[in-house]
Curated annotation (Swiss-Prot):
One of two assembly initiator proteins, it binds directly to the 5'-end of the 23S rRNA, where it nucleates assembly of the 50S subunit. One of the proteins that surrounds the polypeptide exit tunnel on the outside of the subunit. Transmembrane segments: none annotated. GO terms for biological process: translation. The keyword Ribonucleoprotein applies. It comes from Clostridium tetani (strain Massachusetts / E88). This is Large ribosomal subunit protein uL24. One of its GO terms (cellular component) is ribosome. SMART domains: KOW (SM00739).
Length: 106
């Protein structure tokens, strides 16, 4: 069963718990089966890469690892704070996400 993930790709989010608490970044990938998201420059892990045909050099690389979506919250760039969202239907029938604090659309 897939978990409901409240953020989408390219959303700006803030980490609200864990070792990276307070960091703001962009969602790179959403993994709905595991309920996790990959955020830019958050939860960076060190990976030891063996030399291969594609990467002749090998070495140590840094990659963003997934974190649970419950540890991130949507960040509104207009009011500069984390916020929950409302869903609003516009006159033309499209459904948009709206900041609860300032009314800005995402």
């Amino acid at each position: 069963m897939q978990n409901k993930v409240h953020v989408r790709k390219q959303d700006t989010v803030m980490v609200i718990s864990g070792k990276d608490k307070g960091k703001i970044g962009e969602v790179l990938r959403v993994l709905p089966k595991s309920g996790k998201v990959v955020v830019k420059d958050v939860n960076v892990v060190t990976k030891h890469q063996k030399p291969s045909r594609e990467n002749m050099q090998g070495g140590i690389i840094h990659v963003e690892a997934p974190i649970y979506s419950s540890k991130v919250m949507l960040y509104c760039t207009k009011c500069k704070s984390v916020t929950r969202i409302n869903h609003k239907i516009l006159d033309d029938g499209t459904k948009v996400r709206v900041c609860k604090k300032c009314g800005e659309t995402f």
